[in-house]
């Protein structure tokens, strides 16, 4: 599980947690820990939190509202909205937008787009704004695709939690560096990897980030 920051030009993995069934913590517990770390340790002030429907639980949404944070999420069709199942709203019309409450009395704005439902507590924005904002979450999916395909994310042989954390951390760190290089050189991560594979001198031509610190 990873929480990332993006300005839509670059996307940086900020922190992560490894979920273990026997730890006594749920995925929602870990999600709250990551949010807390970003808000109160790193003191990041995000414009909003974006996540998929699994995390759109009453407890997590209320946690974000408590800390005055905006959220955008997809939501399952079997959730109730104004005490009626989403799938039964508006006679099954494929497109609509309405403000109301979901479980726990959480006030949200719901947008239906074809067969999918989206919620936000940023009440009053347009349907287009809500859908476009949620689409930014695709940047997170791109992180996992790239680190799995290109950086060996799933090829960790360590059985220890520390070893796995080190491996995942290195993958995310390399991804962040590649994002910085890609932005400075106006190239994609994949293009950088391809050129570096074909031209051994290519790395010397790049504008690289400056790293500081003592060993």
What are these model-derived regions, one by one?
Residues 1-11, 68:
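Active-site-proximal, Lys/Arg-enriched surface segment
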Residues 8, 55-57, 77-80, 124-125, ...:
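Short, solvent-exposed loop/turn segments at secondary-structure junctions
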Residues 153-206:
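Basic, amphipathic alpha-helical segments enriched in Lys/Arg and hydrophobic/aromatic residues
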Residues 126-158:
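Short amphipathic alpha-helical "interface-anchor" segments enriched in bulky aromatics
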Residues 210-215:
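Long, charge-rich low-complexity segments
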Residues 16-114, 185, 190-194, 198:
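An internal, acidic/charged active-site-proximal segment
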Residues 3, 48-54, 71, 118, ...:
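Short, conserved catalytic/metal-binding motifs centered on acidic residues
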Residues 102-133:
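Long, acidic, intrinsically disordered low-complexity segments
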């Amino acid at each position: 599980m990873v929480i990332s920051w993006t300005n839509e030009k670059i996307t940086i993995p900020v922190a992560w947690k490894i979920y273990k069934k026997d730890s006594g913590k749920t995925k929602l517990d870990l999600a709250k820990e990551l949010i807390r770390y970003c808000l109160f340790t790193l003191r990041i002030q995000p414009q909003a939190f974006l996540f998929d429907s699994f995390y759109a639980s009453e407890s997590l949404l209320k946690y974000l509202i408590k800390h005055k944070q905006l959220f955008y999420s997809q939501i399952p069709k079997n959730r109730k909205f104004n005490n009626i199942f989403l799938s039964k709203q508006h006679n099954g019309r494929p497109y609509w937008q309405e403000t109301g409450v979901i479980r726990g009395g959480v006030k949200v704005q719901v947008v239906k787009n074809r067969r999918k439902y989206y919620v936000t507590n940023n009440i009053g924005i347009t349907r287009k704004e809500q859908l476009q904002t949620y689409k930014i979450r695709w940047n997170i999916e791109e992180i996992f695709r790239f680190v799995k395909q290109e950086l060996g994310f799933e090829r960790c042989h360590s059985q220890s939690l520390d070893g796995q954390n080190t491996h995942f951390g290195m993958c995310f760190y390399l991804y962040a560096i590649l994002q910085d290089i890609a932005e400075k050189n106006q190239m994609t991560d994949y293009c950088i990897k391809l050129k570096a594979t074909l031209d051994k001198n290519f790395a010397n031509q790049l504008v690289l980030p400056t790293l500081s610190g003592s060993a």
